[in-house]
Amino acid sequence: MDYVSTRGSAPHLGFEGALLAGLANDGGLYVPETWPTARVDGDSYAQCAAAITHPFVNGDIPFDVYRALCEAAYSSFRHPQVAPLVEVAPDHYLLELFHGPTLAFKDVALQLLGRLFDYVLAKRGERGMIVGATSGDTGSEIGRAHV
């Protein structure tokens, strides 16, 4: 699967290239060129996450390794469902995204993202450094994301 820039003039990249590039060189965001579909039923959150998102990896990470990365990413969440959907009133539901290690919704993405960076960089024999500035809660999530 190729990733394309939202501004349209950057070169197409594969998963690893888009992951490590962050922003496209034309200032756009890299997004998937196509959107595959997946069916999941009754699996754990980590297993569903692996099944749904692995097609976006385009074979750069074997599925068994990818599933293990997902399981590790969500193992520190305080709720067995990771992000339970709770009925708060008849026909009114709330998706609880605060059960991660920093109690912020960003944990849902960053716990996996950090592991993806670690895997790809190790596979390439490279190291990375992320420098960031924040005035909010993002810093604590990144710090706990194993990047």
What are these regions (language model features)?
Residues 1-144:
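PLP-dependent amino-acid enzyme catalytic core
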